[in-house]
A protein has these predicted regions:
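Structural cue for short, hydrophobic secondary-structure segments
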Residues: 52-55, 79
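Short hydrophobic signal-anchor/transmembrane segments that target glycosyltransferases
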Residues: 69-71
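Flexible "cap/lid" subdomain of the alpha/beta-hydrolase fold that forms the substrate-access gate
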Residues: 1-22, 36, 41-44, 49, ...
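The serine-hydrolase catalytic nucleophile loop
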Residues: 56-67
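Per-ARNT-Sim (PAS) sensory domains and their PAS-associated C-terminal
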Residues: 30-33
Length: 185
């Protein structure tokens, strides 16, 4: 069993614009016992599903202003929190956090929720991870809405800016995310 940290639900009470009902699963194949949080709103049999993937250092809260508009179209909206972010469990061992760990969770979640007619909405790391999903499950994905991300092919080294950002995140584990995001508003 993986050692985890779990943020108490009361820490998420009264967040501005984020009064969405949480959903959890701890039964994803390969992730048994790890609690994954996701938002799942709108009709399960909707003609379209928006699958919203956040980046770092955010979580499903990133999409709080888009969700009502997407729901108004009659669609289903699913927005998971990657492990280590938001309401999902946070494994203690940094070695757990690999590309495959996050990507495979998405594959399992799409299958577990039986999502179809998906519009992938991705930003930052959500794009790096999510843009590989339509190639593996082309029958489930129909459209892409891609924002502020890249499509990593693995044939180029990481840029100096990305390496510096990653090191800064390691050196600042108690990052003031609200303050950081406030600078962009």
């Amino acid at each position: 069993m993986i050692d985890i940290l779990r943020t108490p639900d009361e820490r998420f009470a009264n967040l501005p614009g984020y009064d969405f009902k949480p959903n959890y699963t701890d039964e994803l194949a390969g992730y048994e016992g790890l609690r994954c949080h996701y938002l799942d709103m709108g009709p399960k049999d909707a003609a379209n599903t928006f699958f919203c993937l956040h980046g770092q250092p955010t979580w499903s809260y990133l999409y709080r202003k888009m969700i009502p508009t997407l729901l108004a179209s009659g669609a289903r909206v699913v927005a998971p929190d990657f492990f280590g972010f938001g309401r999902s469990d946070k494994p203690v061992d940094d070695a757990v956090y690999t590309y495959e760990f996050h990507r495979n969770m998405l594959v399992e979640l799409v299958g577990d929720l039986d999502l179809s007619n998906i519009t992938l909405v991705c930003q930052d790391w959500g794009g790096l991870l999510g843009l590989t999903l339509p190639m593996e499950m082309p029958n489930r994905f129909k459209r892409l809405l891609v924002m502020n991300t890249a499509f990593g092919t693995g044939d180029l080294p990481l840029g100096d800016g990305f390496v510096a950002w990653r090191q800064w995140c390691r050196d600042n584990p108690d990052m003031a995310v609200g303050k950081l995001m406030g600078r962009s508003c």
